[in-house]
Amino acid sequence: AHGLPCVICSTGLSAGEEARLEAASEQVPVFRSANMSLGVNVLIELCKQAVTLFGGEFDIEIVEKHHHNKLDAPSGTALMIADAINTRAGGAYEYVYDRHEVRQPRGRQELGISAVRGGGIVGDHDVLFCGPEEGVTLRHRAQSRGVFADGAVQAALFVDGRAPGYYTMSDLLR
């Protein structure tokens, strides 16, 4: 890090790479997020509130959509959303990816994650909370890749001059 604050936005880091970031944060400010969009991170905060308010009585499905050139499925952002929900629920959920091979009723502890790839979709994430008589859908739609650059700039401004430590979008949003 050469004594400079770091802003890291990447998915798929190994445990060793994550450990190196943690170690670097003892010397310099390290800001880490799998998605730099402020809107996605607000969506995550809203999902955590919804999990608390619905108390496990609602089924949860995440549907993410991206352009046809995106390599990973599900996206790192979809997994970030799922992990935030599951952490808030005390690890109660098991992830089920798509359902094309599942031939049984949905289990209460399932958290469904589905991926769609097509055209030039920058990034859409829908989180469905489905109850027996009503449902709530929370959605984020990135209409341009500029939102990720804007978030990265805000993250850089946030860590500039801060003490060494490991910072996330939750810190920036507070």
Put a short name on every predicted segment.
Residues 56-174:
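C-terminal substrate-binding/catalytic lobe of Rossmann-fold NAD(P)-dependent oxidoreductases
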Residues 1-4, 9-32, 38-50:
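Rossmann-fold NAD(P)-binding glycine/threonine-rich loop
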